[in-house]
Every structure is written in C-alpha cells, then in structure tokens.
Swiss-Prot record:
Gene: prf1
Disulfide pairings: none
Protein name: Peptide chain release factor subunit 1
Subunit structure: Heterodimer of two subunits, one of which binds GTP.
Keyword Lyase: no
Gene3D superfamilies: 1.20.5.170, 3.30.1330.30, eRF1 domain 1, eRF1 domain 2
UniProt GO cellular component terms: cytoplasm
Listed Pfam families: eRF1_1, eRF1_2, eRF1_3
Principal cellular location given in the protein's record: cytoplasm
Location(s), subcellular: Cytoplasm
Entries under InterPro entries matching the protein: eFR1_2_sf (IPR042226), eRF1_1_Pelota (IPR005140), eRF1_1_sf (IPR024049), eRF1_2 (IPR005141), eRF1_3 (IPR005142), Peptide_chain-rel_aRF1 (IPR020918), Peptide_chain-rel_eRF1/aRF1 (IPR004403), Ribosomal_eL30-like_sf (IPR029064)
Amino acid sequence: MTEQSAHEKYEFKKKLEGLRDKKGRSTELISLYIPPDKQIFDVTNQLKDEHGQAANIKSKLTRTNVQGAIESLLSRLRYLDKVPENGIVYFTGAVDIGANKTSMESEVIVPPDPITVYKYHCDSSFYLEPLEDMLKDKNTYGLLVLDRREATIGLLVGKRIQPFRNLTSTVPGKQRKGGQSAHRFQQLRLIAIHDFYKRIGDAASEVFMAVDHKDLKGVLIGGPSPTKEEFHAGEFLHHELMKKILGLFDTAYTDESGLSELVNAAGEKLQDLELMGQKNAVRDFFKELIADSGKVAYGESQVRANLEINSVDVLLLSEDLRAERVTTKCSVCGYENKWTRRWKPGEPAPAAGNCPKCGSSLEVTDVTDIVDEFSELADKSNAKVVFVSTDFDEGSQLMNAFGGIAAILRYNTGV
C-alpha cells in the first residue's frame, strides 16, 4: 500500500467492512474494477452489451434491478474524464434492506494501490478481494541464507516470500588434494570462501538496494554457524544495508526452503518490529497511569474534554473501535440530545425514539464517527494519533478495559 496515514487506512478498512455486509438477491450487485490503462470507451461498450444481455433474465425484478445498476454505472462514467492513476472501483446494485425491500446503493473507491486487472462482476455480494488484499501488510524485508557452498537471496513482501537468486561456490572441501601443502591448501580455501562471500554480498546488495529505501524495513540473515557470523563480520553487504540487519538466525537449509525457515525463525522479531511503535505508546500510557501522574485520560468523555483544551500529546485509538456520535432532535419542542453507540457493520441505523419532553418522534440529525471526530481534534492541536492493534496483550487491554480510547497528556489537567 502506498503511504497512507493511519486514519486513511482506518477509513478504507471501515468502508470495505460496510460493503462486505451488503447483500443482494441473485446477481443484483455489480462490482466494476477499472485499471488506469483501461479506456473508458471500452468499458462503456461492455456495459451496454451487459445491459442488453440482462434483458434475458427471467425474473422481472432481478432484470429491472440489474439493468438499473448498469444504467447507474453508465451515467457515472459519462462524468469520468480520465481514470485515476491507481484506477477506480464502482459498486452498485439493489441491496436487501429487510422487510422484503431493496435499496439501490452505489459506492465509488479510488484505491490506495494500483488496480492491475479489469473486472466486471455480478453476484449477491460485492467482489472485494483485490481491495482487501491492499490492507495486508506490505512491509519488505531482505532475506539471505548461506553456508560455504550455497546461498539464496529473496524478499519477504507482506506475508509472501519471493526468491530472487541462488548462488553456488567452488570452495574446496576440507580434504586437500595430493601434492599440496596443508598451508597452501588452507590459503586457497580461505581465498575461495572470501570470494564467495563477496559474490553473495554483491548479489544480495543488488537485490535489496533495488527496493525503495522507505519500503525495505530490514535484512535477515540465516544459515549455520559460523558461516553467517563470518559473513556479517566481513561487512560484505552495502554499507547502507549493514545498518538494516535485524539479526542472524540459525537455519539448516540454504536453498529456497531455507528462506521459509528463516522467516519462521525470525517470526517473533518481525512481529515485534511491526507492533513496536504501538507497544511503546501503550506502555507509556500504562506507565503514566500506574505512576498516578495525572497525565493520562481514558474513555470517550475524558479524552474528548482534553482534546478540546489541546492538552493531549498522544491519542491512542484501537483499530477495532467502531463508535458513532448520534444527534437526535425534536422538531416540535426543539429538544436535542447527543449520545454514543457502538456499532458493527451492517447494523441498522440507530432508532431515534420519542422526545422525553413532549412525546413527539425524534429524528436523527447527525451521525459522526468517533474516530473521525477525535482524529480531527487531535490534528488541530498537533497531537500524535496512534492506532493500536489488538494482536498483543496491551493492545487488547486498551480495547477491552478502556473502550479503545485513551490519551497521554502534556500536563495534568484534572479533567
């Protein structure tokens, strides 16, 4: 995924959650993926063909809904002068809203990563897999496994291992040939080992340096002892890559299977690195909490109050937080109320209820996502926002014990 703020990633994830929960009847939901190099004229022609074919659908209701969705897409495409550089995705169709009713709904997404394949898809649910893949971790790590006879170079991109190079050596075994002195043989062997290490270093540097320096998070080296230690001590990698070495790990294999073995051996280290910033922020919060310094706030009302007086230094929001601030108003007597509800994708809109003063029906006048509201307040006061995963104990505790909302303050406010 291209560089996104944590809040943009949250918004993208939330939007996909909402789409995932929408269901239609038969094949009434259309997903249209348009890559950046696709001509709009070609897309329009295919949609017109699909509209004609939809006339053959036996069910009148399904036929009407599918053709209506295609007409909606054609109408939108008329206003699209150029496909965005990452492509564009349209979702439209008759969504089941219960009580044997449907609602024609549409959503447009410009993805954070480029779309590579054109796709027109009709089903009872929206086709989301390519967009969901963009949410997956795309951090890149250099992988190198070696001994004195073989080396394999690869990359770990997200969760996928990509082998790049395999090298073999001409380093002689420990038994010398007849006619050579032991000293001479040992000298030749050490030269051959050094030359092989240099070949490995040059090849690995070429592969790893081709990765954008912002994406390459580190280098992992595996193999038997003392080979990997010798290679590391000899500084055969480019000097910029030497700074990125995260650790040396024991592996039995130095072929492609050795790359998988290396990733497994370094699994805990990789997970710690990915979560380190989050862990440090949450631990700082607990440290201040235990010290009773008064420089923490938690829960929606406390944190909101401190955000409003610009006293928040670090805002902690759980990645699993789903909450809305709902405003209801009585049009008869003017009574107004604000309240918060936790929500899950696909749940119905909050019931407004009746006015406690005059008994008239209340209407929902505003619904604001808590994450949007708090992120905007934090932005205004230059507070750092950290989205916290529940994949580690402290992150889970933040969600379960503190409602997914906490803050480290710049000073004790007493609020």
